[in-house]
């Protein structure tokens, strides 16, 4: 499908990347994200190998902010986005940094205004494959991400959605959006403009097997990836 929005928007983002203002990684385009954490500054030597350090009264992130658990170096926001009490859409741009032609995506939920952890998986992890190992445009969207199992919320409750993208070398990028649960009628409408899947990005399943020589995947393995297939089918149906 044709990528929505203008090419000029992507060009502007690439310009920021090249200017050194952003050594970018992952962006949650719907329902939004905590804030601009696409920053890389300072050197590894200045931080003594740490992901964050204070130098001359300023905080540096030599590897980039998004490598920092749990939300890419961004604090909790008071400007929360409304999200449906029964679950809703999540759209991501995964190709903002080199090394992400293949990646695993995790989507978790943390409950409360300032969640003590992000230990509630919303969907099984899934793989994406992009067109190149260099930065690339494109969006993926899951139109109906459910609440974690055995989770009950009501309108007005606070939570944080965490998106993790693990690169092929195992390093993880973190991004979050702080939400307030609301009735669907109070939530920004999901459309083909804010929730779509770019044709240059494909999905892959993640499953376990007891034998690499088996001619067919075990039934339990197939059942374990069924939720991902269902979400992917819903996604492509919206294209």
Swiss-Prot record:
Recorded topology in the membrane: Lipid-anchor; GPI-anchor
Chain residues in the propeptide: 215-239
Signal peptide positions (record): 1-24
One Pfam family named in its UniProt record: BIM1-like_dom
Gene Ontology cellular component annotations, sorted alphabetically: plasma membrane; side of membrane
Cofactor note: Binds 1 copper ion per subunit.
Cofactor(s) named in the record: Cu(2+)
Any one Gene Ontology molecular-function term assigned to this protein's record: metal ion binding
Lipidation (GPI-anchor amidated serine): 214
Disulfide bonds: 71-176, 141-195
Keywords: Cell membrane, Copper, Disulfide bond, Glycoprotein, GPI-anchor, Lipoprotein, Membrane, Metal-binding, Signal
Entry annotated with the keyword Transferase: no
Binding site for Cu(2+): 25
Protein role: Lytic polysaccharide monooxygenase-like protein that has diverged to biological functions other than polysaccharide degradation since it does not perform oxidative cleavage of polysaccharides. Acts as a cell surface-bound protein that functions in the copper-accumulation pathway. May also act as the major cell wall sensor that regulates MAP kinase-dependent hyphal anastomosis, the fusion of hyphal cells.
Protein name: Lytic polysaccharide monooxygenase-like protein X325
């Amino acid at each position: 499908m044709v990528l929505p929005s203008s090419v000029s928007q992507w060009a502007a983002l690439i310009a920021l990347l090249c200017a050194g203002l952003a050594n970018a990684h992952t962006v949650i385009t719907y329902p939004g994200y905590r804030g601009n954490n696409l920053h890389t500054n300072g050197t590894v030597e200045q931080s003594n190998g740490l992901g964050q350090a204070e130098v001359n009264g300023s905080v540096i992130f030599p590897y980039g902010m998004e490598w920092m658990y749990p939300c890419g170096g961004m604090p909790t926001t008071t400007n929360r986005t409304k999200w449906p009490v029964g679950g809703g859409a999540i759209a991501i741009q995964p190709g903002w940094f080199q090394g992400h032609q293949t990646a695993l995506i995790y989507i978790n939920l943390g409950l409360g205004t300032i969640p003590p952890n992000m230990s509630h998986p919303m969907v099984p992890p899934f793989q994406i494959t992009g067109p190149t190992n260099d930065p690339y445009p494109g969006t993926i969207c899951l139109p109906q991400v459910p609440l974690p199992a055995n989770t009950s919320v009501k309108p007005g409750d606070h939570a944080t959605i965490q998106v993790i993208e693990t690169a092929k070398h195992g390093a993880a990028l973190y991004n979050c959006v702080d939400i307030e649960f609301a009735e669907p009628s109070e939530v920004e409408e999901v459309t083909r403009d804010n929730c779509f899947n770019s044709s240059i990005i494909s999905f892959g399943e993640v499953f376990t097997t007891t034998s690499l020589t088996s001619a067919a995947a075990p039934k339990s393995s197939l059942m374990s990836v069924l939720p991902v297939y269902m979400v992917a089918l819903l996604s492509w149906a919206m294209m």
